[in-house]
Amino acid sequence: MDRLFDLAQRAAQLEQAWRSKRLARVGDTSLKLARMDAQAYPDEAHACAEGLLVLDGELHLDVAGVAVTVTAGQLYMVPAGVSHAVRPGSHGTLLVIDA
């Protein structure tokens, strides 16, 4: 099991934007890495809360009809059951924290 993760290197190896790769589990929680591109991503909601940590770049969200921008170093927590979508223009690397 890996214990040290070079997130920039791992993100560069991701073949497809918005297709996350699970790096590890901590209890019931998954840590997943995703590469963002400028394309929008469809609306979704989850049974559990989801953390979106922007490692570099910007994430542009629509959360229940409200525009939210998350920049590098910021963590946005999407509450369980809340509808959210990625707006066009997002870019960079995202760490997704979910159950």
What does each model-identified segment do?
Residues 38, 47-60, 64-65:
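Glycine- and acidic-residue-biased ligand/ion/polar-headgroup-sensing regions
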Residues 30-46:
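Conserved short histidine dyad/triad with adjacent acidic residue
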Residues 65-80:
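Short acidic-glycine-tyrosine-enriched beta hairpin
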Residues 1-33:
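A short, N-terminal "cap"/entry segment at the start of jelly-roll beta-barrel domains
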Residues 29, 37, 66, 82, ...:
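A generic "binding-loop/recognition-motif" signal
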Residues 27, 55-56, 71-72, 90:
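A cytosolic small-molecule/anion-sensing beta-strand core signal
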Residues 80-99:
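Ligand-binding loop in jelly-roll beta-barrel domains
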